[in-house]
């Protein structure tokens, strides 16, 4: 119904924000990390939205990036995963880390999200592992400076996994191999060379 809403932040709560656009105040439920990135009241923001309707419930969920929205909608296709669990996952893992966790069948990372137990993590992996493309593994990682080690590490991991997939290796095999030999500060080229030797 709404692709995004652009307006001013009027109120921030623990689980939602109110954005005024065209004289209408929209209550948008979102991850705490997104709320914290929205700036102070009066700030102009653009928030991507998903209009969730079930029986007598109609709720707007919002996201700071298209990648988070895509991740949310992908999670909703999993049996037993509702909006709250999906938001919990987004609050815990970035899209790139989530995709890597799924294709490498890393249940430990998935269960870090509040409300996601082992059975749910296994179901998420089973339902989504074949739906995640190599483009999704890399497209959600923002360009950043080397000082940001966490994001740079994500980028190296994802690019290395993508390179192995281009060479014909399966996503789960590539992710598992790369995760097992990754070292802080290693380049994509070095990581791929090491991976090819171990495969």
UniProtKB/Swiss-Prot annotation:
Residues 1-64 are annotated as: Domain I. GO terms for cellular component: cytoplasm; Holliday junction helicase complex; Holliday junction resolvase complex. The keyword Nucleotide-binding does not apply. It holds the Pfam family RuvA_N. Residues 65-143 are annotated as: Domain II. It is found in: Cytoplasm. NCBIfam families: ruvA. This is Holliday junction branch migration complex subunit RuvA. It comes from Ruminiclostridium cellulolyticum (strain ATCC 35319 / DSM 5812 / JCM 6584 / H10).
